[in-house]
Each structure stands twice: as C-alpha cells, then as structure tokens.
C-alpha cells in the first residue's frame, strides 16, 4: 500500500459544497472559555527547501532526489506567488540539512535568496530536521546536536545577528522541544502533524490541533502543571478537514490529510473541487472556529518541489477577499503571539464544529464536533440530517500517564480510551452514556450542556 501523500491520487470527481457557518448543536455559538484574549484570524505558510524528498538523518535519505525541483527559479516562483496572494504577508522558509550543506551553485544561490527574503520582506528562515520525521529515524541526542548545528548555520547564513523564532519539524519529541526552549532560546516549534496516521513515514495522532505547551512526558500531551511544563508552544503543521482527518490513512479510498494542502485537494480532486475544499476547510476555522474560540488558525507546509504556486496565490487572494482582517504572519510570530496571551495551558478550551463539505471523505450528512482542553479531547459524530444521537469517536485523556517511544520507531501517537482512527479493538463509537461514570463526570464538569445529549 502506498502510504505517501504524493503517491495517492483520488480519481473520482468531487462535488464539494461550501461550508456554512453552523450553530453548534452543543448550544455553543457563544465563545468558549477563552484562551486568554487572543483574537483574530491567523494564517501561516511554510515553504520547504531541500535536496532529497525525506532526509531522515544527516546521512540517510528516503525517496527521490529533488534538487532540480528546488532550484533558485522555483524558490523565486514560490515567493512571487505568495506576494501575489498576500503582498504584505510574511512567510516561513524551512531549509533541510543537505540544502544547508550542498556546495552546488544552485544551493548557494538558494541560501542567498532565503537570507535576502528575510532582510527584504521579514520572512522567517529556519531549519527542518529529519524530513518531518526526525524522532522516527534518529535518537534524541543526535537530533539535539543536529538542531543546534543547523540553527547556528542559519544564523550565520542570514547574518545580522539573526535567530529563528521557531523550528519547523513535522514531528518533534518533548525532550527536544525542551532543549529548544532552554538551550536555544526558541519558544515555538511546529512539532506535530495533527491526526496523521498510516500516511508517509510517521504516525502521531492524539494531540490538540491548536497551540499548547507540551508535557515532558509526551509531545502530544498538554502540560498539566508546572512540574511537566515545557515553555515551547507546539503548533500543528497542516490544517485538515476534520471529517477526512478522522480516517486512518487512505481507509475507504479517501485521503485523511485532505484540507488546505494542494496535494490532497487540487492534485487529487482537480482545480475547481480542490480549491473549493481548501476554502471550505479554511472556513471551518475562520468562520465557525473563530466564533467559537475567539481566534482562528490555519496553517500548511508546502514543499517548494511540489509546485502549485498558482494555487497558493489563488488561495491567499481568496482568503484576503473573504476575511480581509486575516493576519498572514510567520510561524514563529504566531506562536509567540499566542504565548504572549497564555503563560500556561490552564485556559485551553478549543471547540470545533463541522458539517461535511461534500468532498470525498467529508460526508455532507455528517457533523463532527471537537472539544479540546488540558484534561482531554473529545470528538462527537452524528448524522445531522436524521437527528441521530452523537457518538463518541475519540476520547483521549491527558491526565493519564503518557510515555513516548524510547528509541526511534514509526508510532508516536497518544491513544488511550477511544481513538478516532479505529485501529484498536476498543476504538468502537459509543454514546457518552456508555463511557465509565468517572469519564462522564469528567466530561460533564467541563461541558454540562452535553448531559442532555448523552
């Protein structure tokens, strides 16, 4: 089975429908218990410059050589597309280990361009270790040393005392996020790929899709208090359609990573349906999500090698026309803005409510609701056209002890009571009333309005 995002092409035509702002059936169009006072709509775009498709360690590569697709003209094309879509925006560039070290004139020019973009536009330039999958392929200590050396090289490359405000990692273990904060002075890490499982080279479902401070126990667990607190804001890397994201890999012939990324949308569905899904997914956060949470956050990492520059320009233009107050800023700037309003996780209370868009894997007759806080995450699914009762498809408790793998391996998820992917015998959807009395009390203490829907 081809697990890669790029290798999956969905042949069927899509007939997606725009997502309307919906009133939460939990009675929650009032803003949830606020994550401090952060307000607004925020979009971050990351472009990756690399040599090999997946540089899992400094000395090991998986996948194809992409040097031809990362040449300077491709980098210029990407920046021009971003500027057409958002002339006053700032973006983040993530450069790989091999791209930092490659002596070919094309990569010398690429590095010069990235430094120029920082000085001219205020773009952020940072490091991407392990081709998104550093913990899956290398030890914590090796990754720490690699991060340290690469960040020093980037400071030298950009000059002027420059220091990145974040690390773009795909996945990054808790210990190395602690090192970023304490040793490198970096307090933002794109450190998880929310809901990713059975796709590409690493699995990591179980976390929160909006910012949080990770626990020393596990990078997907929000810190519970001072004892396990890591002062590094952990960010998701790709905003996905929540209904598509509940699936495991390509189960049922659908792509669980479908959202605002071009591979899973335009690449699989065609320009019309694909762009519609990109906007529908954006609306989940900038319409309903912003109303529920006080702010909306949409993010995606687009490798320079994949192209789709016209789709990037179109999407950014469409976002600015529909939500003109959107702030298009760097990854580090967004994380630090959230950090400014949140000294810890005590006010975490994110809520999301999506009715399907009609794109493949996002069924129009289904509604999914997510509740995410420091103590647990809860997902409810039901057929809203029939008035079916909500079923719990995910209940992950964060008050329980968690432990990361001790050595490199593929599986870095955090699963306990019920997980949305349905990969274990216990992952069967149930009514809230079928959970243990203790778990019901835990849920109702946070969301008493769910009692009538149990």
PLM feature spans:
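N-terminal export signals
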Residues: 7-28
């Amino acid at each position: 089975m081809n697990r890669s995002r790029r290798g999956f092409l969905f042949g069927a035509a899509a007939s997606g429908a725009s997502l309307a702002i919906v009133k939460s059936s939990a009675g929650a169009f009032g803003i949830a218990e606020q994550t401090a006072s952060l307000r607004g709509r925020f979009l971050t775009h990351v472009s990756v410059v690399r040599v090999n498709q997946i540089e899992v360690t400094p000395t090991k590569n998986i996948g194809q050589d992409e040097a031809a697709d990362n040449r300077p003209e491709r980098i210029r094309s990407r920046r021009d597309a971003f500027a057409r879509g958002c002339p006053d925006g700032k973006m983040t560039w993530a450069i790989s280990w091999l791209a930092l070290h490659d002596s070919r004139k094309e990569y010398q020019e690429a590095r010069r361009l990235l430094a120029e973009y920082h000085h001219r536009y205020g773009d952020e330039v940072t490091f991407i270790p392990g081709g998104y999958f550093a913990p899956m392929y290398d030890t914590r200590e090796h990754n720490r040393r690699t991060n340290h050396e690469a960040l020093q090289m980037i400071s030298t490359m950009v000059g002027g005392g420059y220091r990145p405000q974040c690390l773009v990692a795909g996945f990054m273990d808790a210990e190395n996020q602690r090192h970023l904060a304490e040793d490198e002075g970096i307090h933002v890490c794109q450190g998880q790929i929310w809901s990713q499982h059975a796709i590409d080279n690493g699995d990591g479902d179980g976390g929160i899709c909006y910012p949080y401070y990770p626990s020393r126990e596990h990078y997907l667990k929000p810190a519970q208090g001072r004892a396990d607190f890591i002062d590094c804001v952990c960010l998701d890397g790709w905003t996905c359609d929540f209904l598509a994201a509940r699936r495991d890999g390509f189960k049922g012939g659908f792509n669980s990573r479908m959202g605002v990324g071009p591979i899973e949308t335009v690449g699989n569905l065609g320009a019309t349906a694909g762009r519609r899904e990109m906007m529908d997914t954006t609306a989940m956060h900038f319409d309903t999500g912003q109303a529920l949470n006080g702010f909306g956050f949409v993010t995606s990492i687009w490798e320079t090698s994949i192209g789709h520059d016209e789709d990037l320009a179109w999407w950014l233009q469409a976002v600015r026309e529909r939500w003109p107050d959107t702030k298009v800023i760097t990854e580090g700037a967004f994380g630090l803005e959230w950090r400014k309003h949140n000294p810890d996780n005590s006010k975490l209370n994110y809520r999301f409510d999506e009715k399907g868009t009609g794109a493949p894997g996002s069924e129009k007759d289904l509604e999914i609701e997510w509740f995410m806080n420091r103590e647990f995450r809860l997902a409810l699914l039901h057929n809203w056209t029939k008035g079916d009762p909500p079923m719990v498809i995910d209940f992950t408790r964060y008050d329980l002890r968690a432990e990361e793998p001790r050595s490199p391996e593929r599986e870095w998820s955090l699963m306990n009571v019920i997980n949305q992917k349905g990969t274990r015998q216990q992952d069967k959807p149930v009514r809230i009333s079928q959970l243990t009395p203790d778990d019901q009390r835990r849920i109702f203490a946070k969301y008493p309005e769910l009692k009538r829907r149990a």
